[in-house]
UniProtKB/Swiss-Prot annotation:
Enzyme class: oxidoreductase
Any one of the GO BP annotations: glycolytic process
Family listed: Belongs to the LDH/MDH superfamily. LDH family.
Annotated positions of the Phosphotyrosine modification: Y226
Predominant cellular place of this UniProt entry's protein: cytoplasm
Source lineage: Bacteria, Bacillati, Bacillota, Bacilli, Lactobacillales
Pfam family, one: Ldh_1_N
Domain of life of the native organism: Bacteria
Binding site for NAD(+): V18, E39, K46, Y71, G85, A86, S107, A124, A125, N126, S149
Protein name: L-lactate dehydrogenase
Purpose: Catalyzes the conversion of lactate to pyruvate.
NCBIfam families tied to this protein: L-LDH-NAD (TIGR01771), PRK00066.1 (NF000824)
Organism expressing this protein natively: Streptococcus equinus
Amino acid sequence: MTATKQHKKVILVGDGAVGSSYAFALVNQGIAQELGIIEIPQLFNKAVGDAEDLSHALAFTSPKKIYAAKYEDCADADLVVITAGAPQKPGETRLDLVGKNLAINKSIVTEVVKSGFKGIFLVAANPVDVLTYSTWKFSGFPKERVIGSGTSLDSARFRQALAEKLDVDARSVHAYIMGEHGDSEFAVWSHANVAGVNLESYLKDVQNVEEAELVELFEGVRDAAYSIINKKGATFYGIAVALARITKAILNDENAVLPLSVFQEGQYANVTDCYIGQPAIVGAHGIVRPVNIPLNDAEQQKMEASAKELKAIIDEAFSKEEFASACKN
């Protein structure tokens, strides 16, 4: 995709709760000029119905071609977004989904690549860091053109939680969650700030917040998905808008800094050969470069521990015969 191309085409693979919410976000925000929705054959009519339903909103937003797509429609797409996979159930961790979703991911990526697709993959299916890695392996694409949603939603939750605690606009809070999109993620407290003022200094000047309150706040962010899943069965609105934001950055060649699942080549000491959440510059050609925030010793240890856990899952998954050949690529 070139920065000057005017007609932007997105193919969505997976029309479940996350996928359909993402499609709705694209329509609402006027992102892309063409949206194709791919579903498995037995759910093809769901994609047809959603495309028709979404098209009825176009008179209120902006022109867009929306349709139920097939894999051959990926050939000239700028972006393929993968949300398809088994959903996380109450009591399950995201990493519990590996066995179910790796085979699904392989079949999807194989079909997309077979179409002649030359664009960018954006992965949101869980466990997103593992499935972003598998998308890279199965596709043979350059690492810059395979991106995961990573900790984009976690960071948004973190900013919102801090904003509520401090009674300020979340857009004025700048803070990141890094590591796995899951239980081993961590807050980068050392670089959190409000309007450029270091969070620690801001808290001293503005209000007295105990450390225990901040620990509880982070735990609420980390466990937010479990809380929502127990209440309503799934999370989809937040991640849908996060995906729309990433999509906009790619299609508009923004060179925006967003927390994404990014390939690691030693940016953080011993963290290599995996995808994991960190800030990165993203534009029309995918990841321009990672933004390597200097971590303190405690944060560095958490980053390495998170990567170690992901690597163990990846190594175990790709030791199986049906996936082992991808690791030789």
